[in-house]
């Protein structure tokens, strides 16, 4: 059996110390370009296990990966229909440019750990997907000079984003509900700080999600005289919508309409109605946001946004040198189905 090639083998072949070989990979700035290239070439010639990917990265100055940052657990990226659609679109473009995706969940309970993860990540760019405003991980990206594209609009003309007009989209829902005569509403809000098993009412200041805040403002604009309560059953999930709806449906102060700020929460609310033998659109209106595939099956009135196209466009802004736009506003559409109806008298 041939002896394994180690860092010492490479060092002896080049005539340098093992630490110098290590610097060629970890601290390239400490070596001259000629020496670094000589070490990398010899390592590849000897078949040193491990230098190939690092050598390519050093020569090109590219990590070959884009980070996807989101404030939730890792499982969210694989279970939430909106996240799955967005990542599918982003992955199509990443594959075209031979780039990997690095999923980076930034836990709201471990702020420092999230910032450290961003500090250490080997990425060429970052897609900011559903990250809490002000998270230190975002500041760390700026300090590292890593290009970013957000899915939230930013007033800074130098920022890059691919987004919808959250307020105008929600205003379409609000206008629809106002025409149906609704004036007592509950909004189901995702909130990772809320208890996992007990739904709670929130104030506007407790929402903590920039997109959610704009959607609530859009509803308020079209329903100026309405009573609008905010309820959270936890993070953005079917179970959270179920818990939040159960709280209001079992109270003596039942609203005439429930608005899920995502379809998954609205679908959870419809399940809560089903177990109480209530019919959406007749006994109580339920509407959502996103138009995921399950929304059509359930007959859910919602706002359609181009989820997969959003992911594709984020990928273009990050990776495609021929794509010159850096701020892209995507269209939305009100989709009316059977879950919305006139307010009961």
Please give the residue ranges for each predicted region.
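Hinge/beta->alpha junction and helix N-cap segments in small-molecule ligand-binding domains
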Residues: 73-84, 104-111, 162-172, 187-244, ...
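Glycine-rich phosphate-binding loop signature in dinucleotide/nucleotide-binding domains
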Residues: 46, 180-182, 248-254
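Short acidic/polar active-site loop segments enriched in Thr and Asp
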Residues: 17, 64, 124, 182-184, ...
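Alpha-helical recognition/docking segments in bacterial nutrient-uptake
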Residues: 1-6, 20, 65-68, 73-178
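Flexible loop/turn connectors
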Residues: 242, 246, 251-345
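N-terminal helix-turn-helix DNA-binding module of bacterial transcription factors
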Residues: 1-64
